[in-house]
């Protein structure tokens, strides 16, 4: 049941991760959870907003809707923003920016829409205070998110600022590294319950390994992050924020399984080690230079494998034969394992030659991809396409 201090929030995410985000929110204690497309809305209080920014693994950012306008014309656009009491949210001494998303027959140019809204806001400040806040599109203190669907414009405060996938640990990257939010979502979609060892056999800069370790020990992904835009809000409560941080930190647990990775590139191994150390997980993750195709499973116990095979410019090879080698290696050397592959090369994926247990549509950046899960057991049958 909601209290008077509760308000609605919206967590943005990637396509295909909405259910994972719902589950995360439910576990954190969110109320009135409603799944959308690439977003989930929910209800909580100020402390819960802080908690979500620190703890959610599959959220890109957390928005706080503050008002909504009916807008069809330029005049309505200007007057709506000019008449709203922005002084409750923006100081005349501060800076702000506006980001607009339009799904409407009435407006088609997001930059024009943002500019007109900005004019209404700054003219109000000029009238009230004879001066106005600055516009800063790079590093604003306050960021407004405008979402126009048909003639309804929802205005939200962006509480996060930089996307929440920017955990702060990735100092070194390779070409086209996987997004941290997507990696965390894939790990949770895989069904891994931390009851067996975890391997990324093509670990690149170590994103899957780091996210897996943080999930396994219940380590909040943005605990070490300092920059959140809600810290610039007029109602920011630093004492409450520290209480929330202390509370979620107390729930970090120990690691009972082995998390390890291979990469055939020494440079990638070195990059992953740097990132793992930055995340403070060097005592929980092992990385070795190794060619997956000549490796064998280290033991007979169950093993969870998750990886993002190189693609596009990353390796100039015959991808069909490359994926066939992946399937052959899994079948011959990694029985009693569950292997999850995320790839945008849907044609090459057919050549893995194993019967998949699960297939989920995702997007890796702008690339339509599939997360495909295989159960590898003695005598795994070839899949017939």
Please place each PLM-identified region on the residue numbering.
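C-terminal edge-of-domain segments
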Residues: 144-160, 372
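Short, charged/polar, Gly/Pro-enriched secondary-structure boundary elements
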Residues: 47-54, 162-165, 380-381
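A short, flexible beta-alpha/helix-coil linker loop
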Residues: 103-106, 163, 310-314
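SAM-dependent Rossmann-like transferase core, predominantly class I methyltransferases
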Residues: 155-189
